[in-house]
């Protein structure tokens, strides 16, 4: 993928992840740590009970992190498939005898369209993740 296009996607995804971390994940981390601390304050509990309590406290955060990771992987896979299609199209054009400059332009245009299309998916993906993260916290 063209470096500029890659940078555009990376900055948009980084911004989304920072927003999710600030608005959702961080609150869940705070709850998890306070919950875990309460487990440790339980003087009558056995070591195993305290450990299980801490595991229960950590479960929502682990679920949230898994959700974000899964959505980002799906997004990355879709973008990779799109750019792979562009590469295949360019290779087919070269095999058919097209000029290299024409093929490069065609490839650039195709990759830019992939990036534009996927950039347009980010707001919906963000909203969907925020909704899912909110429901995990409850």
From Swiss-Prot:
Modified residues (N-acetylalanine): 2
Similarity comment: family membership: Belongs to the FAM136 family.
Name assigned to this protein: Protein FAM136A
Pfam families hit by this protein: DUF842
GO cellular component, one term: cytoplasm
Disulfide bridge positions per record: none
Residue numbers carrying Phosphothreonine: 124, 126
Organism: Bos taurus
Entry keyword set: Acetylation, Phosphoprotein
InterPro entries (alphabetical): DUF842_euk
